[in-house]
A protein has these predicted regions:
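Active-site/ligand-binding-proximal alpha/beta "capping" segment
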Residues: 166, 172-208, 266, 273-277
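Histidine/lysine/aspartate-rich catalytic loop segments that bind and position anionic ligands
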Residues: 134, 138, 142-191
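His/Asp/Glu-rich mid-to-C-terminal helical/loop segments that flank catalytic regions of hydrolases
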Residues: 239-279
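Metabolite-binding pocket within alpha/beta catalytic cores that recognizes anionic/polar moieties
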Residues: 1-157
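Short acidic/polar active-site loop segments enriched in Thr and Asp
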Residues: 107-108, 208, 227
Length: 279
């Protein structure tokens, strides 16, 4: 058996002993959405530390637990604190939680994050729906022997972000009168913020926002046949767009200020997605 698949299986079996909850939607909380899980109808909470072999987030503001419960009547599995490649984990460990949530039953992966705005039309506090991504600067989570249990060797990436889910997000934002931006997200390895020259490069190849997560998670989910959507909170202008130095604290504070509106948008999206799953 493939070692990576074996590790995911072992984690899955441990979680199944703790709960028989079956989610429809897997939600990954980025900066600014940290306390969202506390506002749902909670069924079970599982700390990452309780799962032997599971990677644990070391980033300030990322709690490190799964919260399973209901948004309205839609069963969701929330990842409260993702792990990042820059923390020293292998890429297979970075996406292990995504694979686990799929094995738990999730059909949709809803990704959120805080990012730096590259597009000149973006301001701190804006929300960008991710319509495409660039992941060429971090290792693919699919490198190595293919895990046949998850998917095929060469998965298509033409429509990685589901168009029907994008329409759901548009309608949700319109209903809440939230100005929704759209664009391409690029993942760079981090943990250092990007240089102005790197941001100019990102802009030249078509990126609108930059961060240190998300794209690799989408690749793993796409490999397994999940429907994927994503919203990025623009926390700050990227390096060179503004002359102000970048700090993690500033990113966190900006994301926290946008949190109430972000949480309303996420809830509205999940409710609408849940209705579409029932059809």
């Amino acid at each position: 058996m493939n070692k990576i698949y074996d590790k995911v299986q072992k984690c899955y079996k441990q979680v199944k002993k703790m709960t028989d909850f079956k989610p429809q939607i897997a939600l990954v909380l980025g900066s600014g959405l940290g306390d969202y899980a506390e506002k749902i109808k909670i069924e079970t909470v599982i700390d990452y530390h309780e799962i032997k072999g599971f990677p644990v987030s070391t980033v300030q503001g990322h709690k490190g637990r799964f919260v399973l419960g209901y948004v309205e009547d839609i069963p969701v599995m929330i990842m409260e604190g993702r792990v990042h490649y820059y923390e020293g984990y292998s890429m297979s460990d970075v996406v292990l939680p995504i694979r686990l949530m799929k094995m738990m039953g999730a059909e949709i992966l809803f990704l959120t994050n805080a990012s730096g705005g590259i597009h000149r039309g973006f301001e701190a506090g804006d929300f960008m729906m991710i319509t495409d991504q660039i992941a060429s600067f971090v290792p693919s989570p699919l490198m190595g022997p293919n895990i046949e249990e998850f998917g095929e060797r060469f998965p298509d990436m033409s429509h990685i972000y589901d168009e029907e889910l994008q329409e759901v997000i548009r309608k949700s934002a319109d209903h809440l009168q939230i100005d929704l931006k759209e664009g391409t997200y690029i993942q760079l390895p981090g943990p250092n913020f990007e240089s102005p020259a790197e941001i100019r490069m990102c802009k030249a190849i078509g990126a609108d926002a930059v961060g240190m997560s998300t794209a690799c998670e989408a690749i793993a989910a796409n490999h397994m046949g999940m429907k994927i959507c994503g919203i990025s909170c623009i926390a700050n202008p990227a390096a060179g767009i503004s002359k102000k130095p970048l700090t993690h604290e500033e990113v966190q504070q900006s994301a926290d200020r946008a949190a109430p509106k972000f949480q309303k948008l996420v809830t509205e999206c999940i409710c609408r997605m849940g209705k579409s799953l029932k059809k």
